[in-house]
């Protein structure tokens, strides 16, 4: 649209009449008259067929101070068929135009007749990506004046040839917890236009050949799924029901050809029809499209069903006639090139020498993700491009991306997240999991009395990882323009070459996470200037064009606060509580900003009677205002042409989510002998690091050698219904100023979408824990196994009605950064419906721990998620962690069935299947550090011990070796010596002792606890780190247990905007080799009754005392 509008402006400028007086040559005056056009048109374009209908067009001309009215009626029909090995391409263009011009002042008539020429071309090439489009149009214009009759003939031949499209298979690189996928695409497009004009016996032939070679390399970080904490009995709901933004496809540019992957051969006796698919993202997983071929006269059924009482099944059957449908979509498109040129000729029929005027406009428009201000343009022949950035997390993670380009250049992106605290504690992952996320507190049924009721809280926490992964996109395009103009036998050849390289980085933006009523986020992207120098052989002149774009985005998010149930312990029942966690990120694009809102639904079972009645309505209202200012300047010789375009897009998105949760009864049984459980609540600020470790010690006064606890929970059917309505209004205001003229027009797009999602999960969980101790030898053995099977039937119905859609989206969700969808597609007026169903989800996890004289640790986890849906992939992931090796594998299979019937009779259907199996990757990380400290000084004051330590030197060496297909990649980082950093450390200790007895119906149990609080403050020149460590030793009936909790608070570095609360787990294996466990953002919530811990009269003063002392010290 922008290119065509630019051509119209240039055409108007060229046709500005001169100031000479009106002579008797009426033909010259008529040709140089400014025509004001007021037209309305309705068009529909697709690869299958194309129809264009133009309504009445009125031309108003000042012909001797009288009105001149010109009426034009025309229709145009184009058919295009993809070329195959035995099929030819037939392009037919039919145009009928009739022009009648009546002058009031003198006898002046003008008529225009058009004749169409049909041409066909055939080729014997077997390349499926070879397309010929040829059309010839001849228009004859006859003008009759009182003195002369002039006949003008225009013949235009358009030849559109797509020669080569190469799609190289994707490459995957797995480094630790991240997976990078590289897609390489190369395409060559040749467009040849022949324009023959005959005006008054003078013939002019203009030939233009445009060759575009685009090489694209896209590096993305795909799905990381989400981090899940399993507590033993929970209702597992993956975040697939989150509100999603409405993605509106954009019309395809004239020189952009969708990818055609030659994965299977098409029978030579069938016809291949190229379909254009409309992509709407409905899940939180990345989707890759490829080509699937369906044989002729075959029936492809697709059915899916679920298991459980609440069953939702859908069976769809597709029948194809004697044609093979070939549908493809280029999912990794991040930019598209639009080449356009305009020719304006003005020729007089006088007796003077024939003159010709030629005006050229060459526009290259690129739509991609935002250009980071710190991105650097590097030549392809350089060896490496290194980009560093610091993120807001406080743990140390190493990730690297290796890019292998055909020109033997390396691009390595290292992301280093500094840690401002040092943790040297040994953490038992399984014990920490039980103590922090499994507050199951119960005693034998014989000890239950009315004064000390039992409270059972089984919770599930599903939190998405914010990995701050970036998608780096490198585009290299080469354009060659060859023009040949022949005027009366004189031939002039113009040659223009252009080489453009774009390096863009999709920068992660922190998501607002708050419960306030209104959140306003303003993002101002720095001005991105792209200067392209075109070297043109045109009589020695040089054309220099400069484009400047400025983007400013304002996002306003409005949502209602969370509704919380009030707990009651009067009766032993169960209910469900729904909590919503909203995270949003504005993704800046060239013309319109999309708002991604993800919602995580957690189900918590408690003995409660809520005020919400199981109904919570959440409304998101986002207003995205994007203003783009483009300044286009062309300097040639002494002339300068400057055009300023201002585009303001105001998009309003209203998402209303109304989940209805039907609670059901649940059964809970516990059989145990002499057990104790403790639940601890830690309250931290948003910039804190929580580290927990649990150490169990046994005394010789143990009465039982074996302790076995079994918890079995079976949750019946739970129905969840979510009605989601999305309303999107986009208003675009275009303002173009060229020289002295200004043009303004506005477009408005309204899109309403309603989704109804019904989820019926059934969960069966079994948790078995055993503990064996020996009185003579300090050895312990604990094991746990969790087997959970969820059957979920998820039916999604999407109905979309839209009048006009024109957008290119780059979707980068903030919650997991896993979903980076870069797509460009076209759509038509009509309706669309999509159905989604999920069959089952299975999850299993196991962990074992064995402790003796030498400390050895091993853990294994297995996660299997099986799903069958339209747009959700099946994921199977296994992670085994031993002493120094890790193996990760990922397999994704996606099947999409889509039907899009329209009111105009045009329909497109696609069956897409994609299988992505990354390469085997092994990675090893070794890190060594050494620190030298000066002697410490101690002083005692009021019972508190203060220690001051001054550090002198610190060295750190980190080496990482990654093996991909027997190819090793070594990344080594060495931190130099710090001389005299002047770091002071202050340690203060305090001890609290509590003792008492617990009386039950039959016995009296003594209990005592000792709490030692250590405060460590480390101050440097710019930051201060405060660490509070609480060591709690409690004894119940001569069984002693020691628990250590540590809270570290540190201000964020100056580069960070905000910090987050993270739960960090680390393991020390053989006291030398670390095993890195991913850091997950988990909000800690304490729910339970202190009486169930065995404390008499609800004496939880030790918990309150610890937290109060910690807060006072902070």
Swiss-Prot record:
The keyword Nucleotide-binding does not apply. Residues 942-963 have a biased composition (Polar residues). Residues 844-910, 922-941 have a biased composition (Low complexity). The keyword Glycoprotein applies. Residues 232-256, 284-314, 392-430, 764-784, 844-963 are annotated as: Disordered. Residues 1-21 form the signal peptide. Disruption phenotype: Affects filamentous growth. One of its GO terms (biological process) is filamentous growth of a population of unicellular organisms in response to biotic stimulus. Glycans are attached at residues 382, 397, 475, 490, 506, 539, 565, 591, 637, 687, 739, 831, 957, 966, 1070. A lipid is attached at residue 1089 (GPI-anchor amidated asparagine). Residues 1090-1114 form a propeptide. Induction: Induced in biofilms and by alpha factor. Repressed by HAP43. One of its GO terms (cellular component) is plasma membrane. It is found in: Cell membrane. It comes from the Eukaryota. Residues 240-252 have a biased composition (Pro residues). It is a lipid-anchor; GPI-anchor. Keywords: Cell adhesion, Cell membrane, Glycoprotein, GPI-anchor, Lipoprotein, Membrane, Signal. Putative adhesin which may be involved in cell adhesion and virulence. Involved in the regulation of filamentous growth. This is Filamentous growth regulator 23. It comes from Candida albicans (strain SC5314 / ATCC MYA-2876). The lineage of its organism: Eukaryota, Fungi, Dikarya, Ascomycota, Saccharomycotina.
């Amino acid at each position: 649209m922008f290119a065509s509008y630019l051509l119209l402006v240039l055409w108007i400028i060229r046709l500005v009449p001169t100031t000479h007086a009106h002579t008797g040559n009426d033909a010259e005056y008529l040709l140089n008259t400014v025509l004001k056009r007021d037209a309305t048109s309705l068009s529909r374009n697709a690869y299958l067929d194309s129809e264009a209908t133009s309504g009445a067009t009125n031309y108003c001309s000042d012909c001797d101070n009288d009105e001149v009215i010109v009426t034009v009626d025309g229709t145009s029909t184009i058919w295009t068929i993809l070329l195959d090995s035995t099929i030819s391409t037939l392009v037919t263009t039919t145009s009928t135009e009739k022009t009648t011009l009546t002058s009031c002042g003198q006898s002046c008539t003008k008529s225009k007749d058009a004749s169409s020429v049909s041409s066909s071309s055939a080729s014997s090439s077997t390349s499926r990506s070879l397309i010929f489009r040829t059309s010839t149009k001849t228009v004859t214009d006859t003008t009759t004046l009182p003195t002369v009759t002039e006949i003008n003939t225009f013949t235009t031949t358009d030849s559109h040839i797509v020669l080569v499209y190469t799609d190289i298979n994707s490459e995957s690189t797995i480094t630790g917890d991240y997976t990078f996928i590289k897609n390489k695409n190369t395409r060559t497009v040749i467009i040849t236009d022949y324009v023959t004009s005959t005006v008054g016996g003078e013939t002019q032939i203009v030939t233009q050949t445009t060759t575009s070679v685009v090489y694209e390399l896209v590096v993305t970080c795909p799905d990381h799924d989400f981090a899940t904490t399993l507590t033993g009995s929970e209702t597992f709901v993956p975040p697939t029901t989150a509100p999603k933004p409405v993605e509106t496809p954009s019309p395809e540019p004239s020189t952009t050809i969708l990818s055609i992957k030659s994965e299977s051969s098409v029978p030579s006796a069938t016809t291949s029809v190229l379909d254009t698919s409309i992509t709407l993202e409905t899940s939180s997983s990345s989707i890759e499209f490829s080509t699937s071929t369906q044989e002729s006269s075959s029936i492809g059924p697709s059915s899916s069903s679920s298991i459980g009482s609440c069953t939702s099944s859908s069976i769809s059957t597709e029948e194809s006639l004697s044609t093979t449908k070939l549908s493809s979509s280029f999912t990794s498109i991040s930019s598209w090139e639009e080449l356009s040129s305009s020719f304006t000729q003005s020729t007089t029929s006088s007796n003077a020498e024939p003159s010709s005027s030629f005006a050229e406009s060459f526009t290259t428009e690129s739509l991609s993700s935002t250009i980071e201000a710190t991105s650097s343009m590097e030549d392809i022949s350089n060896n490496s491009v290194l980009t560093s950035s610091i993120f807001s997390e406080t743990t140390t993670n190493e990730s690297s991306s290796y890019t292998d380009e055909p020109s033997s250049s390396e691009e390595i992106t290292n992301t280093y997240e500094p840690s401002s605290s040092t943790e040297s504690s040994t953490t038992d992952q399984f014990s920490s999991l039980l103590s922090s996320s499994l507050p199951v507190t119960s005693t034998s049924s014989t000890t239950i009395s009315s004064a000390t009721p039992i409270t059972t809280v089984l919770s599930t926490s599903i939190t998405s990882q914010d990995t701050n992964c970036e998608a780096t996109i490198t585009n290299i395009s080469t354009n060659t323009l060859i023009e040949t103009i022949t005027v009366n036998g004189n031939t002039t050849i113009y040659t223009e070459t252009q080489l453009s390289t774009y390096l863009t980085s999709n920068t992660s933006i922190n998501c607002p996470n708050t419960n306030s009523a209104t959140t306003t986020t303003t993002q101002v992207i720095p001005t991105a200037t792209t200067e392209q120098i075109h070297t043109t052989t045109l009589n020695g002149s040089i054309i220099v064009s400069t484009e400047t774009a400025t983007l400013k985005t304002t996002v306003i998010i409005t949502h209602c606060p969370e509704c919380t149930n009030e707990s009651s312990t009067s009766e032993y029942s169960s209910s469900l509580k729904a909590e919503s966690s909203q995270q949003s990120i504005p993704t800046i694009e060239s013309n319109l900003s999309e708002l991604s809102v993800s919602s995580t639904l957690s189900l918590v079972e408690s003995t409660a009677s809520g005020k919400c009645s199981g109904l919570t309505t959440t409304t998101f209202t986002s207003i995205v205002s994007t203003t783009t200012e483009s300044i286009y300047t062309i300097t040639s010789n002494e002339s300068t042409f400057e055009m300023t375009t201002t585009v303001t897009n105001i998009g309003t998105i209203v998402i209303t989510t109304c989940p209805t949760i039907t609670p059901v009864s649940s059964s809970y049984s516990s059989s145990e002998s002499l057990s104790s459980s403790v639940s601890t609540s830690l309250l931290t600020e948003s910039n804190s690091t929580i580290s927990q470790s649990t150490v169990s010690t046994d005394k010789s006064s143990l009465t039982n050698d074996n302790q076995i606890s079994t918890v079995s929970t079976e949750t019946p059917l739970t129905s969840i219904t979510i009605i989601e309505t999305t309303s999107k209004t986009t208003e675009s205001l275009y303002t173009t100023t060229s020289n002295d003229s200004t043009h303004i027009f506005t477009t408005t797009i309204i899109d309403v979408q309603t989704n109804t999602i019904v989820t019926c999960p059934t969960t069966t969980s079994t948790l078995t824990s055993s503990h064996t101790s020996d009185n003579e030898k300090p050895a312990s053995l604990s094991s746990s196994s969790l087997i959970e099977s969820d059957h979920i039937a998820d039916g999604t119905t999407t109905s979309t009605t839209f009048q006009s859609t024109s957008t290119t989206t780059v979707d980068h969700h903030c919650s997991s950064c896993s979903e980076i969808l870069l797509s460009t597609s076209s759509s038509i007026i009509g309706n669309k419906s999509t159905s989604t169903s999920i069959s089952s989800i299975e999850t299993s996890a196991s962990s074992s721990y064995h402790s003796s004289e030498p400390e050895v640790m091993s853990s294994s986890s297995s996660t299997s998620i099986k799903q069958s849906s339209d747009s959700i992939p099946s994921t199977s992931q296994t992670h085994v962690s031993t002493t120094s090796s890790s193996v990760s594998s990922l397999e994704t299979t996606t099947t999409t069935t889509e039907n899009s019937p329209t009111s105009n009779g045009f329909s497109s259907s696609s069956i897409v299947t994609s299988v992505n199996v990354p390469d085997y990757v092994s990675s090893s990380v070794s890190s060594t550090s050494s620190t030298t400290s000066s002697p410490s000084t101690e002083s005692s004051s009021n019972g508190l011990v203060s220690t001051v330590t001054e550090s002198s030197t610190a060295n750190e060496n980190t080496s990482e070796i990654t093996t991909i297909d027997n190819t090793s990649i070594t990344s080594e980082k060495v931190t130099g010596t710090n001389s005299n950093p002047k770091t002071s450390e202050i340690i203060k200790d305090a001890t609290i002792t509590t003792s008492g007895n617990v009386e039950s119906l039959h016995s009296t149990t003594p209990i005592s606890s000792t709490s030692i609080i250590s405060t460590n403050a480390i101050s440097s020149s710019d930051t201060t780190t405060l660490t509070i460590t609480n060591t709690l030793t409690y004894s119940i009936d001569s069984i002693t247990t020691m628990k250590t909790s540590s809270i570290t608070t540190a201000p964020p570095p100056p580069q960070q905007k905000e910090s987050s609360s993270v739960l960090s787990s680390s393991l020390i294996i053989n006291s030398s080799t670390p095993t890195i466990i991913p850091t997950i953002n988990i909000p800690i919530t304490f729910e339970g009754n202190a009486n169930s811990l065995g404390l008499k009269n609800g004496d939880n003063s030790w918990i309150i005392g610890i937290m109060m002392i910690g807060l006072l010290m902070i």
